[in-house]
Amino acid sequence: MDAFKGAMSKTLEVFTFCNIILALASLVVAQCVYQIIYYRFFHPLRHYPGPFWASVTRLWGAYHFIKGDKLDLEWQAIKQYGPIIRTSPTMLLVADSTLMPAIYHRRDTKARFYLSEMFETSGSLVIRDPAKHAAHRRLISATYSMSNIKRMEPLLDKHILHFLEKLDSEYAQNAKPMDFSTWAAYLSYDTVTDLGFRNPLGFVDSASDVGGLIYQFRLGMLLFATSGYLYPLFRWLTTTWLKKWLIIRPEQALGFGVIMKRANEVLEERKRALTEGRIAKAVKGDASYDFLQAFMDTRTPEGEYLDNKTIRAEVFVILGAGADGFSSLSSAFIAEVLSRPAVYGRVMAEIKAAAIAGEFSQPVPLFTEITKNLPFFLACMQEIFRLHPTGATQLPREITPNDPELVLSGHKVPVGIEVTCNPWIINRDYNIYGDGAEVFNPDRWLGDPEKIKFYEKHSLTWGHGARFLMYFEVSICEETPETPKLESEIYGPVLGWKNVWLDLHKRRSWEQQ
């Protein structure tokens, strides 16, 4: 008996708290070593080069995304290793634009990075299944058509004029420097909420982020993308009691939850207003027919109206991705053009010539007038779209058994692997744009029409193939009239950028110059 007690005592001594912690730590270390050895020497992607830590853990991508240098590191890795690199244990990043049709084809499946399970109802941007995406696209694509958007030009003009008046009174007259990117976001959100549901929120009037929507959307994007990089962990967490905190719901007061709450309020207010007779139901062709009413009128092939969750998901897209894209393009144009005196001079000479010749409607030129009379300005816009795409992030697809065979660097890519391109990187393909691929050169978009078609074919700014971004026409119609009007009314100094501040001055009419 004493011998048994002695043996038990020695056994218990082994299982002390410190020893248990040490054993668990050893298991973790052993698992990490196993994972490194497997991913580096036995995984199907072992043949592809890339940053070491990216090849063995998804934490590399999440960490550098949060840090803000992931894009730069990937671009440098491509320059070092070649056009196909490994950026996660199961993902390849492709910088060869000629391979886009093989990656973004009609039957491609979005990778699990998109976390469609994070939303109660998946909007058009996160539907993974190609058949479901195609069916959804057929339902809502007419809403975003160019003809429908051009009909709303008077609304765009109204917001552009109010925006310029505000800049004049707040900054030009008082000789105060401004952060243009912030105000571009205000204009964008007011315009999009008016186009979307006739309810501008007053960002420009209040000179503030109304309801924190801009901040919350960008915070939501940070959380969404970080979770996407770590999708195995996120998907596991949704099987635990934490699920109710991870699924985006209007009740949440953080990130996308705030945007979803606002989308829900927009829909419910419209339904109440129609029921109570406070507004008349607009019909297609009316000046008051907006995106929201178009969604509410949309029917499925079975003749059913879209349910509230689906409509709310599309309003969410308008409030978030739709509004934020325009502000980034406007800021890029100002930065690129004002820092190049020769380019700026050509843009202004072109605008002045068209204005003096009476080619522009007043007070804001029409989209068609700009496309007809400002070829160099449009070339600048094309170059902005190329070098500063709104979605400068990965757009991964998952290889499935139904996909055509994909061979990269001489190796067949197996099922389950993720393959991605990045618009910022793909639009700098030296094989397409030559030695000046990283240089802002609007003249590349002038001249040979076949060359221009070639560039457009190999661009990823607005997506590719069956998932071409429907909202791009809204961004183009917002950006195109706003910039010439801004340049003709108010100007900033032509300079090399040292900070975000811009000094504005009221411009005299063209006839007085």
From Swiss-Prot:
Pathway annotation: Secondary metabolite biosynthesis; terpenoid biosynthesis
Classification via InterPro entries = Cyt_P450, Cyt_P450_sf, Cytochrome_P450_monoxygenase
Task: Supply the alphabetized keyword list.
Answer: Glycoprotein, Heme, Iron, Membrane, Metal-binding, Monooxygenase, Oxidoreductase, Transmembrane, Transmembrane helix
Where does the sequence pass through the membrane? 14-34
Q: Which GO terms describe its molecular function?
A: heme binding; iron ion binding; monooxygenase activity; oxidoreductase activity, acting on paired donors, with incorporation or reduction of molecular oxygen
The reply on keyword Transmembrane is yes
Give the family per the record.
Belongs to the cytochrome P450 family.
Q: What is this protein called?
A: Quiannulatic acid synthase
Record the organism. Answer: Emericella variicolor
